[in-house]
UniProtKB/Swiss-Prot annotation:
Gene: torY
Cellular component annotations (GO), alphabetically ordered: Gram-negative-bacterium-type cell wall; plasma membrane
Parts of the chain that traverse the membrane: 9-25
Protein name, UniProt field: Cytochrome c-type protein TorY
Subcellular location: Cell inner membrane
Binding residues annotated for heme 4, in chain numbering: C160, C163, H164
Length: 368
């Protein structure tokens, strides 16, 4: 009887020992597989390692270094265990040679980045917040832009990864020729009787005297008719007195419709003159008859807007979450786009189209 009791005690102690050993072993394995040395032991991880070593998260004036696990593995709880198990797929991919060289790595960079961004968005940038906290920020010591952005982020419930993409690892390239995407999406020459038509891009037009009028993307013509491969229509807009070279869509809002040469400015019909208190200047409401190539105009405003939104989503989401058009006023969008365009691969025509799309759908504009 005593031996039976002793046997049970020994068995229980052995089970406890096995449990403790398994728990300690699991913790040891999880810890060792979270080190930069382990992460970079796979050949495919040498590429992100080089990017990390060139970033401020590796070396900085403060002497603080963020390890791989600091950003990619939540510190505790279910998210921690989940991250470790999901990481097993990386070992499988390494064995299969999915990203065995630089070319394959680049081919999958966007896919990998989107997965990480999605996870960080879902957990409210948990790993970022283990070091960075809104509560600990002294906004008064930040730059004007950082202070404004962080204040808006707190108000709107945004999370770190919404804006802070590409600060350690290179951003994925936006593949595909945007002009090719546009030509397949916005076909000029698609016209519907009785509806307004819009320029698909910046295009040269002329007035009835042959003077040049350059229409901007989204420039609207009314009372139009087809004449062979040309369209005759009426452009309606506003000019600021003293700066008549530019025709704007609305009074006081600098949404460019057209640029006119010196002779063309003298051949417009002035409908009325209004003093605008905001700009403290006089504005002329005008109309002008123009001739333009049929292939450069469309009635399909929906598809044209989809193209503008596509530019916003693909080009402007590399560094931060794409900002909705109704976030800023029409005039504010000019400065916002100009301050960020050099960080994208957009060409001048694309910048122009994006700016006007955002302006037309700004928060102080009626739904377009």
């Amino acid at each position: 009887m005593a031996m039976s009791k002793m046997k049970k005690i020994v068995t229980a102690l052995c089970l406890v020992g096995v449990g403790v050993g398994a728990l300690w072993g699991s913790q040891w394995i999880m810890h060792k597989t979270s080190t930069p040395e382990f992460c970079a032991s796979c050949h495919s991880m040498s590429y992100p390692q080089q990017e990390w070593e060139g970033s401020s998260h590796f070396a900085n004036a403060k002497g603080v270094r963020a390890q791989c696990s600091d950003c990619h593995i939540p510190k505790e709880g279910w998210h921690y265990v989940k991250a470790k198990f999901i990481a097993l797929k990386d070992l499988w991919y390494e064995a299969q040679g999915k990203i065995e060289n630089k070319e394959k790595y680049e081919a999958h960079r966007a896919e990998m980045a989107q997965r990480v961004w999605k996870d960080m968005k879902a957990n409210d940038s948990e790993t970022c917040r283990s070091c960075h906290s809104f509560d600990a920020m002294e906004l008064s010591k930040q730059t004007k832009l950082a202070k404004q952005t962080h204040t808006e982020a707190q108000t709107n419930g945004q999370t770190c990864i919404d804006c802070h993409k590409g600060i350690v690892h290179f951003l994925p390239e936006v593949h595909g020729d945007q002009n090719t995407q546009k030509s397949s999406a916005v076909q000029g020459g698609t016209l519907s009787d009785g509806s307004a038509i819009f320029a698909t891009e910046m295009v040269k037009a002329t007035n009835d005297k042959g003077n040049e009028v350059r229409l901007m993307p989204y420039a609207e013509l009314m009372q139009w008719k087809v004449d062979g491969d040309q369209i005759q229509g009426t452009l309606h807009g506003w000019q600021q007195v003293g700066a008549e070279a530019v025709v704007y869509q609305e009074l006081g809002k600098r949404i460019t419709l057209a640029l006119m040469d010196e002779d063309a400015r003298n051949h417009v019909q002035v409908l009325k003159i209004v003093h605008d208190a905001v700009t403290d200047s006089d504005w002329k409401e005008i109309s002008v008859a123009v001739n333009v190539a049929k292939e450069k105009m469309t009635s399909d405003l929906t598809t044209l807007n989809q193209y503008g939104n596509q530019l916003n989503q693909t080009q402007c989401s590399g560094c931060h979450a794409a900002i909705g058009a109704d976030h800023y006023t029409a005039n504010q969008w000019i400065g916002v786009v100009n301050s960020m365009k050099d960080r994208t691969s957009m060409k001048k025509d694309e910048v122009r189209a994006l700016t006007i799309y955002l302006q037309r759908n700004a928060k102080d504009m009626a739904k377009q």
